[in-house]
Amino acid sequence: MAKNIQAIRGMNDYLPGETAIWQRIEGTLKNVLGSYGYSEIRLPIVEQTPLFKRAIGEVTDVVEKEMYTFEDRNGDSLTLRPEGTAGCVRAGIEHGLLYNQEQRLWYIGPMFRHERPQKGRYRQFHQLGCEVFGLQGPDIDAELIMLTARWWRALGIFEHVTLELNSIGSLEARANYRDALVAFLEQHKEKLDEDCKRRMYTNPLRVLDSKNPEVQALLNDAPALGDYLDEESREHFAGLCKLLESAGIAYTVNQRLVRGLDYYNRTVFEWVTNSLGSQGTVCAGGRYDGLVEQLGGRATPAVGFAMGLERLVLLVQAVNPEFKADPVVDIYLVASGADTQSAAMALAERLRDELLGVKLMTNHGGGNFKKQFARADKWGARVAVVLGESEVANGTAVVKDLRSGEQTAVAQDSVAAHLRTLLG
């Protein structure tokens, strides 16, 4: 017997029982995006490796440790995308979408990072990202956060997420803070773990994000990023906070929030939750006004965020069990008798024409009425339409409400109208 081939560790299959809830959640997210006037962009899964090195930063964990990189047959270095922003910016530059233009874009799809698989974090994971180009005021930062808050309300998880905000200032202000932070860390080098010692010179702001309790205790005495902000960044952040307060969105200022990618400036934010065990990030983003120019385009203000769908699905299932997947089937067509199958299939096609958007499944494979009604229950159908030999001969069908058990014989020409009434 041939050996079974299994999925790669950390890259999961999502079976029909799982994809139904994903589809409902994704539908909710897309409806909200449409209500704000955002447009979908579809991007390649594979990009040239230098794109991510230039965008994310060569000394980030993502580039150093986590990317799936390989050479193709031409000897070019290619990478499975670890995030979506860099590819979105690349596409915007390549197709002339950005310079002197305003764009509100979103994308959804798989990303890849070679991390240790754990609950809600996998090597292939799915992200929905949102990117806005050409707008530089705090009002668009606020709109993105308000959009995400609308998602949480629609999904019934608003009470289980908390917004954390920070401003990391301009590139110049951050460089000044970096120097002060490195000087402080050098004085306390013996208290740092090996990872923080390495980051101290390559990417010192990432030390602020250390999960080591001893390092976090040390950082209580470190210089504060807020003390090094330029005046323009202070005003931008104050404007954002005021807009969020006006919108009734509570937030916490977290001066150690810096984000893991090098391209951010000014606003950074995260929505976090404690409802999945240890605190986890549900959605995160910020402003990256220098990235378009860094990747070869003209200077263009930009802001965006990304959200991991695996973690979002887990959170919705954990805190809002009433948020159910839509049924796979609304109507199940039961047919029994030697000459009924072709008539049943013809009726099913007529009903699909007349009841657009209704999900109708026709029984195939035979079976008595009892077995066919059991299949209707399995698929979650609300209504069964029954055709036997006598119904075919009389031009009728029996319509049965599977919730109440009531059934009615109806002329086949009137079945669609009767079903509309039953299904609401």
UniProtKB/Swiss-Prot annotation:
Question: PROSITE patterns from the entry?
Answer: AA_TRNA_LIGASE_II
Keywords, ordered alphabetically? Aminoacyl-tRNA synthetase, ATP-binding, Cytoplasm, Ligase, Nucleotide-binding, Protein biosynthesis
| Gene Ontology BP terms | histidyl-tRNA aminoacylation
Q: Where in the cell is it found?
A: Cytoplasm
Quaternary structure, from the entry: Homodimer.
Matching PANTHER family: HISTIDINE--TRNA LIGASE, MITOCHONDRIAL-RELATED, HISTIDYL-TRNA SYNTHETASE
Q: What is this protein called?
A: Histidine--tRNA ligase
